[in-house]
Regions:
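Arg/Lys-rich, positively charged N-terminal/basic patches that mediate binding to nucleic acids
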Residues: 1-25, 101-106
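GIY-YIG nuclease signature motif recognition
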Residues: 12, 60-61
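Short, surface-exposed coil-to-beta transition loops
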Residues: 54-58
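A short, surface-exposed loop/turn module that caps and links secondary-structure elements
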Residues: 29-53, 99-106
Length: 106
């Protein structure tokens, strides 16, 4: 397995910027580690849909082995965890199209 490219959604970026700098640094460190092994997070119903916890926050990501890409989708606290997970599950086909666009694939 080679290094995975890591991409983020605009939604994730917006929420990430609102966090305290120290939490941002910890989350960034965890995201950087996904380049080498994206399967470290807790699976959420599918092997390619996972979450990682950092302090009181969780970030959610999708793994696309066929493109060697990790797509970091969203960030939440425990309170909104299930709502975010359900939303991502419904939008999985949309996110695949988004990553294809980011990679300039037809």
């Amino acid at each position: 397995m080679g290094e995975y490219g890591v991409y983020t959604t605009d939604e994730f970026d917006k929420d990430f910027k609102k966090l305290d700098r120290s939490i941002q640094q910890q989350i960034k460190k965890e995201i950087d580690q996904l380049e080498l092994n994206p399967y470290v997070g807790k699976p959420l119903g599918y092997p390619f849909f996972r979450e990682k916890k950092v302090q009181g926050y969780r970030f959610y990501y999708l793994i696309y082995d066929e493109y060697v890409v990790v797509f970091v989708i969203a960030l939440s606290d425990k309170k909104s965890q299930q709502k975010i997970i359900n939303s991502i599950r419904h939008l999985i086909p949309f996110y695949k199209e988004e990553i294809r666009k980011k990679l300039d694939l037809p």
